[in-house]
Amino acid sequence: MANIYKSAAELIGNTPLLEVTNIERDLGLKARVLVKLEYFNPAGSVKDRIAKAMIEDAEAKGLLGEGSTIIEPTSGNTGIGLAAIAAAKGYRIILTMPETMSVERRNILKAYGAELVLTEGSQGMKGAIAKAAKLALEIPNSFIPGQFVNPANPAIHRATTGPEIWRDTDGKVDIFIAGVGTGGTLTGVGEYLKSQNPNIKIVALEPEGSPVLSEGRSGAHKIQGIGAGFVPEVLNTKVYSEVFRAANEDAFAAAKLLARKEGVSVGISSGAALHGAIELAKRPENAGKTIVALLPDSGDRYYSTALFTE
């Protein structure tokens, strides 16, 4: 039977779960650690899911149509996902981002035909958000998906990512850990898993250098894609029962460990999530449990960063 897709948008989701058996063995872990490899999405990250969801939600509501321009403040992956879907659907897209984002990310965005507007690095995502809002006022027939506030973000994870994890583990998942950028992944997956089994523990991951969720203060860090410096609107703060803080060095080390032990190259925030999962697996009370960590993207977006240059 033929199995042919008609659009890149149809290729999103159903990403694989990998048990890191070599790491489990070498570290003597008593728990199972599974990683969900979101770089298998067509534009290379978990953000493909929300890009498709936000665009199709806007189309259904009549907010996007022929001749529309999509504008979004993004630290990278959401922009790449949006640029890919915009290309597939024929929309103009303008992305605002801090100048501190990696060169690879910028070049990928340009490859998909996106227009980039770089903002002051010291202002972080807040500066990019303000610039996007200004552009939206100036450009007619424009639409800002607004990943930090758009309910279509957590909704797509409730509808796809969460059910995939439940299905692929045959319902045998005890702990789920994911980084908080917009909070959409943790919220959607967490709510779905909790609806299936209220005893599943959900762990929010944030950078040690910007402990907004655990301590209410923001700061500088090197874990691109998480730790936006504020509590995002779409984050359900009641869904998680623990906040795990990852240091820059631990995120880098875990990403390198995965490449060298399992042959899987992932990005910095993925390293942070894996580090969190490994530390959870070391706890005596978690022996025999199954821990799932969501790894947002691959290492090839970070060759110019400290992940590979140090």
Whereabouts are the PLM-identified features?
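PLP-dependent amino-acid enzyme catalytic core
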Residues: M1-E310
